[in-house]
Amino acid sequence: MKPFYLVAALLLTNLHAADIELTETLQLPECHSLGWVRANTQVKGQKNWDGVLDEAKWGTPSPQQAVERSWDWKLTDEQWQQAVKEKGEGKKEDVKFDLWVPEEATVAKGIVVMSGHGSGENLFKHPELRKIARELHLALFKFVGNPMQRGFWPRSLLYERLKTFGQRAQHAELDHAPLFLYGHSNGTGFSAIFSAESTRVWGWVSMRPGTTYQVYQPSAAQIPGLIIFGEVDDFFGRPSKAENMGVVEAMRKKHNALWNYAVEPKTGHGPGDKTWPRVFSFLRHTFAARVPADTDPLKGAVKLHALTLESGSLGKNWDVTQGGYQTLTTAPFASFTGDKSTASWLINPAYAADWQMFQRDGQITRH
């Protein structure tokens, strides 16, 4: 890896003079990107899952279509390294990394990590997210650049950057702090697929997945996940809205996934101002439920709280035939009367109320 260019700046403002912001730009080869991995390793031919959701609704996909729908890859770092040796690492491109640590976080209890693909750039700078980070003592970390922003291999690439940034920021806890992941569109190739391999992740978000089949990750089933679709997003309509929702419902039914999804009415492929409170509610509630209150990543790896299906609430899924804003029933797991196997899993009653309000009103108005 070539020597990198590092810019470090203390944000000298009247209110928060000790906030830390670090920026680093590296040139990385394209062999790290998921596109290269699909094209140059054996994962494209794997059949860990056949891609069939409901033959009664959509028929049996062709063998080629089924393989293309399977993103549940089994690829070791050694196999990836061998493929790079045989095929070459490809051209190099810039990848920019940014870290922000609030003054209040003398020890960061967690890191919100986001791909800068799409809306990730704006999320990193969002005032409300930074307010939450100050309150919960979280660091924010972002990366953008073709070798990584749509997902990457190997997973250690992120861990290496977090460790390096932790050393330079004098926040060594970044080497072990729990992670919350965000990916927009095909940035889902980061947030969903990375979650399947990391015991450090306390929750993850896929915002308007470009390819919804990327979220079919059985190994991530027990990590709380949120998928948000835009009702008029062209990607949501391919091949159909029902089939895209069906990917999440299949994970719920086949793997008891602790996941929920929402459909934001009258919106397209990008989130808006009313979308972010939905994400922030999920971040807050999952952090409280999974990250121990006395966590200290300076002492090493953090053991996150495991959650059970029965401990949460359930919510009736959005009706694609009705469309628009809908009042969807929620109830504790034991008393929910709908289809428990496919309903959205909601971490607690307070989060369930936010989920319900968002689907009914298109926004969360409580504070």
Segments (PLM) and residue ranges:
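A domain-start/cap signature at the N-terminus of enzymes
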Residues: 17-110, 182-194, 356, 360-367
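Gly/Ser-rich "nucleophile elbow"/oxyanion-hole loop immediately N-terminal to the catalytic nucleophile
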Residues: 104-107, 151-189
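The feature captures the conserved acid-bearing segment of alpha/beta-hydrolase catalytic domains
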Residues: 202-280
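Cell-envelope and extracellular/periplasmic
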Residues: 115-118, 167-170, 184-186, 195, ...
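Loop/turn elements at helix/coil->beta-strand transitions in domains of secreted/extracellular proteins
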Residues: 106-111, 136-141, 175-179, 198-204, ...
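Alpha/beta-hydrolase-fold serine-hydrolase catalytic core, especially in secreted/extracellular enzymes
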Residues: 256-257, 265-367
